[in-house]
Structures are given as C-alpha cells and as structure tokens.
Regions:
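Interfacial alpha-helical end/capping and short helix-turn segments at domain and membrane boundaries
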Residues: 44-167
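Juxtamembrane membrane-water interface segments immediately C-terminal to a transmembrane helix
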Residues: 29-48
Length: 167
C-alpha cells in the first residue's frame, strides 16, 4: 500500500506542478501572442503608409520625367522649392524598429532592407531637390537617377510583399 500511496502522491504532485505552470505561463504566452500580433499590425500600417505616399507622389514618374529631360539638356537644374525645409525625421521609425524582435527573422530582415532602401532614396531625393547634383555631368546625374529609379521599384515591390506577409 505504501507504494500505491507514494505513486498517488507523486502523480498528485506532478499534476499540481503542471497546473501551477499552466496558470502562470498562459497569461505570459497570451501576452506574447498579442505583442507579436500588434507588432505585425504596426509594421504593416507603417509600410502601407510609406507605399501610399510614394505612389501618391508618383516618384517613378518624377524620376522618369527627369531622366528624359536630362538626356536632352545636360544643364537641367534638379532643384525644387521648399526642399531645404523638408523634415527628414521620422518619429514613427523608432517604434517600428523596437518591434523587430517580435517579427519573424526573415520579415525583420526584409523590413530593415526596405527601410534602408527608403532612407537612401529620401537622402538622394533631398540632395537632388536642393540642387546638390547640379554641378554633376549628365552621365553622373543619369546614373544617380536611373539607380534610384531601380531601387525605388525594388523597394516598392518589397514593401508590397511585406504588407502581405505581415497579415
């Protein structure tokens, strides 16, 4: 009988430990699930906003038009009024980057690639619109514009894929 009582006690103890672990882990696991879901939603909305603004401003058309003009006129200025005051700070970016650890590794990697491509385009666009490339040769201007147009298309395609993957 002692063996039966010991086995029963061991089983009862094991059930108690499992029950205790389940009740303490369940809220943590649920919170982690909610955090991951929120990170995907925040990131998806952020990327969607960038895509919407890029498509609204139709930067591809802007690049193509400027390429056509520069092919005809080497001295074409690439300056835009108001560009000097454009704010390059993105107050949402740190929030999105803080969520990286909650995303799948491949999604986090592609997100960083997308953000870096977008940053590079913004920097070059601002430099162009400030007239910082005006002293470059036609070939140099065309190289920058054509490279940026290719990066723009790649970034927009990657962004659209990320939005789907983040659902």
């Amino acid at each position: 009988m002692m063996v039966g009582g010991a086995v029963g006690g061991a089983i009862g103890g094991a059930v108690g430990v499992v029950g205790s672990l389940a009740t303490s882990l369940a809220p943590h696991l649920f919170q982690r699930y909610r955090d991951k879901k929120a990170a995907r939603a925040i990131t998806r909305a952020y990327i969607s906003g960038i895509l919407h603004m890029e498509e609204f401003h139709d930067h591809a058309h802007w690049y193509e038009g400027l390429i056509s003009v520069i092919e005809l006129d080497e001295n074409q200025a690439m300056k835009m009024l108001g560009a000097a005051n454009a704010d390059m700070n993105d107050f949402l970016r740190p929030t999105v980057i803080a969520q990286l650890g909650l995303l799948k590794p491949d999604v986090a990697g592609d997100l960083m690639l997308f953000l870096n491509m977008h940053d590079g385009l913004r920097i070059n666009l601002k430099a162009m619109t400030l007239g910082q490339l005006n002293d470059h040769t036609r070939q140099q201007k065309l190289k920058v514009l054509k490279s940026d147009l290719a990066v723009w298309r790649d970034a927009m395609a990657l962004g659209r894929k990320l939005v789907v993957r983040l659902k």
